[in-house]
Design a protein with these regions (language model features):
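N-terminal catalytic cores of NTP/NDP-binding nucleotidyl/phosphoryl-transfer enzymes
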Residues: 1-29, 34-39, 106-109
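Residue-level signal for inorganic ion chemistry
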Residues: 14, 60, 103, 128, ...
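Short, flexible loop segments at boundaries between secondary-structure elements
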Residues: 126-140, 157-164
Length: 194
């Protein structure tokens, strides 16, 4: 099967995440898109409480439940240690060697991927589907893709998706200020309790 992977803290999951998954599914003829809430992300200073993690997982479950080709994967959420993309991909290949994996990410992640732990191990494990953002023009994206393909033999495809300037950080900030998050989030999602 052709499996798209969307990882992240999803605090909260929002329409931008779901649109990326849907557009990747259609454009690259994926069989499923797996959403992986990260249980212990290495880039966060404070670890989630069990309650906060359960809240994030439940938000993702609710967000993907009505889409037959979206799946919630608890692979990273169940771990007590930090989860890293390279390791998750290795584990998926060991568990499901028949699958072909497509890692879905935004332009900001494509430009910072060399800072990820053992980032070189990611490239042989998947095709990266990179979605553009407004702040990265197509020339910069093409140059970064060519750089990663040339230097690391990465397989990268450009994901054509709507450019929505939505981030979970913006949503959390708006909610903390008692400002509306209507139409940004789904009705049943909200930032996790701290």
């Amino acid at each position: 099967m052709r499996i798209g992977i969307m990882g992240g803290t999803f605090d909260p999951i929002h329409i931008g995440h779901l649109l990326l998954g849907e557009f990747a599914y259609e454009q690259f003829h994926l069989d499923e898109v797996w959403f992986l809430p990260n249980g212990n992300p290495p880039h966060k200073e404070v670890e989630d409480t069990e309650e906060a993690l359960a809240h994030r997982v439940e938000m993702v479950r609710l967000a993907v439940r009505e889409n037959p080709h979206f799946q919630l994967s608890l692979h990273e959420a169940k771990k007590d240690c930090h989860s890293y993309t390279y390791k998750t991909l290795q584990e998926f290949h060991a568990l499901y060697p028949e699958n072909e994996y497509f890692f879905i990410l935004g332009a900001d992640s494509l430009f910072s991927i060399e800072q990820w732990k053992y980032f070189k191990e990611i490239f042989p494990s998947c095709t990266i589907l990179a979605a553009m953002r407004d702040d990265k023009d197509s020339f910069d994206m093409q140059r970064q893709i060519q750089y990663l393909e040339t230097n690391y033999q990465a397989k990268i495809e450009l994901l054509q998706a709507p450019l929505l300037e939505i981030s979970s950080t913006t949503i959390r900030n708006r909610a903390a200020q008692n400002r509306s998050i209507r139409y940004i989030c789904l009705l049943y999602t909200s930032p996790s309790p701290r």
